[in-house]
Amino acid sequence: IMIEGDANGRGFQYPIPTYSITKNFDWSETENNKLLFEMTAKYGTPYFSNYINSDMEPSDVRSMCCRLRLDLRELRKKSGGFFGSGESTGSVGVVTINMPRIAYLSKDESEFFHRLDKLMDISARSLKIKRNVISKLLEAGLYPYTKRYLGTFNNHFSTIGLVGMNEACLNAAWIRKDLTQEEAQQFTIKVLNHMRSRLSDYQELYGDLYNLEATPAESTTYRLAKHDVKKYPGIITAAKEGQAPFYTNSSHLPVGYTDDVFSALDIQDELQTLYTSGTVFHAFLGQKLPDWKSAATLVRKIAENYKLPYYTISPTYSVCQEHGYIAGEHFTCPKCGRASEVYSRITGYYRPVQNWNDGKTSEFKQRKVYDVAHSVLHEGRMNKEEKAEVKGNCQDKPTKNLLFTRKTCPNCKTSKILLDKAGIKYVAIDAEEQKDVTLKYGVTNAPTLLVPTGSGYEVYDNVSKIKKYVEDQKN
């Protein structure tokens, strides 16, 4: 059904499935793979999570409610991307910071960071106020369904994002270069790390989760640029002369930079991994890939050679009312000459280009699509060290099985039942009340089971791993 599209050949806007690419992903010619990658090649529907080289774990998408908050400066990843959020998590709100305006108004780098800090302080405080208000409303019974199924906003993030880092570098008097240049890239890395540090400060100050997001900014890129051009006629935007103004999303490259997907990935890989949520690389293609194998090969190459957490394969396609699906960009049907709809991805969703706002339309006109057939992957760019199975090697290793739990964790109860039914003895540790023991063994999730071995101890840090351990003991 997803491959056929609707009655007119349009791809379905929803659902937007997120597929996890792990080291154990089966790349063989199965029927499921043919369907998945044919859908990817034709409509670009799915998102892909990179669990091969990124710093994410497959269990992360389910583990937010069980994470232990022992280090208030730890910036956690908001897993699942835009469309696959983990259980019991989300954002209470998002504030997007206008980076080009800060750069334009700053005479030097020091003033830039001073202005950025001021805006981040205001953003963090406003998000704290919003969190307090909606939490009071939740407790007062105004969100009965949320209260029943979610219970609390404690695992929700206060999100701060940015827009237009490419144009910020162009407007910065001390740089005057775009993100294709090394100097601008290094400044961007410095800015993102600085923002991460400030977010850790806010976590300590307010006691809430904060994260740094590459916000989609579907309309914000146009709205902020439009207001800036009106107020500051000399400010540089991403638009060409005569076009509606817009800013480049987050720290993305100029949309017309290259048609080599791997050249773009080489630069974006280092930048996108500094965000803790919302970041995604869209591989914009001019048209449908030739077959499902081509799509599978590209998805695999990206996962195995880059660290970025989320990406899409995004071909452009057109739809004629009479003749249905047409590969590529055709504003008039090549068969009947009638006007047709051109579909491309706009910050996550496929929408007809004719319906985009003026700023995003300018972006589409400038966008250089990737030529996969002539893109060159630089071999050996990743140091592919196999991660060993996590094992503790503490001098004071436990003499008995230790199960770290939390009172409000449903998976902790499940783990106890599994161990009890199997007759496996253990000592239950309340991870929050016995924090010294928890810190001693570096436990960050609940439930976590520590099993002593000859050289140290094995770590099973979620209910799935504990269940697998129990099954192995039975065999």
Predicted region positions:
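Conserved catalytic cores of very large enzyme subunits
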Residues: 1-154, 175, 181-335, 342
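Conserved phosphate/anionic-ligand binding catalytic regions in large, soluble enzymes, centered on
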Residues: 88, 152-169, 338-355
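Intrinsic, low-complexity terminal and presequence regions
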Residues: 316-335, 341, 345-398, 421
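Thiol-based oxidoreductase modules, predominantly thioredoxin-like and allied folds used
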Residues: 405, 423-436, 445
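Short amphipathic alpha-helix with an adjacent loop that forms part of the alpha/beta core around
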Residues: 437-442, 470-473
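Structural micro-motif
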Residues: 441-450
